[in-house]
A protein has these predicted regions:
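Short glycine-rich or small-residue beta-strand-to-loop segments that form or flank ligand, phosphate
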Residues: 50-53
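Short polar catalytic/cofactor-binding loops
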Residues: 9-13
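Acyl-thioester C-C bond-transforming condensing/cleaving domain
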Residues: 1-2, 15-46, 61-119
């Protein structure tokens, strides 16, 4: 099955210790997921899987991708994983999603990356 991108969203770009300092990576990821799902015209329960790249994972708690997904309204039954591959995490996540869709394992996925360089 071919894989297509139906929505693309990014979070604001900030400066270290500036306006976004109070936002965790999972909170920023949730904003992007919520908007991507809305712009794609799907309901939050439609994705089969959430896979997000996230490099600076120390201190973020367990599976920040799952935290972001739940905060974005994705049901708890939808699995989520965080990938850590320095400077390539979001592309690795998108590649993983693409491979799973082309293999026929999944139909709809949320894939991308999230980061907070301040906290």
């Amino acid at each position: 099955m071919p894989s297509v991108i139906v929505s693309a969203v990014r979070t604001p770009v900030g400066k270290f210790g500036s306006a976004l300092r109070g936002c965790s990576a999972a909170e920023l990821g949730a904003v992007a997921i919520r908007q991507a799902v809305a712009r794609a015209g799907i309901v939050p329960a439609e994705p089969d899987y959430v896979v997000l790249g996230h490099v600076l994972q120390a201190g973020t708690g367990q599976v920040a991708a799952r935290q972001a997904a739940i905060a974005a309204g994705i049901p708890r039954e939808v699995p989520a994983i965080s990938l850590n591959n320095v400077c390539l995490s979001s592309l690795a996540a998108i590649g993983y999603a693409d491979a799973m869709i082309r293999a026929g394992e999944l139909r709809t996925e949320v894939a991308g990356g999230m980061e907070s360089m301040t906290n």
